[in-house]
Amino acid sequence: TDEYVQVLAPLLRGERVSFAGDELRVTAGPVQLADGVPVPVLVAALGPRLLRVAGQHAAGTITWMANAKAVADHVAPRIRAAAEAAGRPDPRIVVGLPVAVHDDVAEARSVAAQQFATYGMLPNYQRILATGGVDGPADAAIVGDEASVSGQVEALFEAGATDVWA
């Protein structure tokens, strides 16, 4: 992933690339960009290694199942430190979580538990859920009435998210 991002990101910025790594050897570009607009590369990253790669070489990261605590304590500090060490601008942190605007929080969490149970069985998601201090995907989901959901989304931005998708 590291080498791939080191090649792909500059190509999608319209730059020429000459790269020789352990796995890839590439001389290419510059590529023709639609309307000359660079394409940002965002790496799906939850763990320390890929957050480092994203910070060093990409425009940012896209997460899934990382709640505000996980973003503040784990995702944002790691990716920002990597970007800073590489002399790069602050990265985008795109946070994705299930969202349900519903008056019955227990019912909404019950549905979320069924719909997103698979994530609770996968090691990478188990780690990010634990980092966020929750037992499973249903507990990470943003649920409640409009005011509650709005506050929970705002907490993601306060934790370091630059974008939120739901």
Predicted regions and their residues:
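Active-site-adjacent structural elements that line small-molecule/cofactor binding pockets in enzymes
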Residues: 1-166
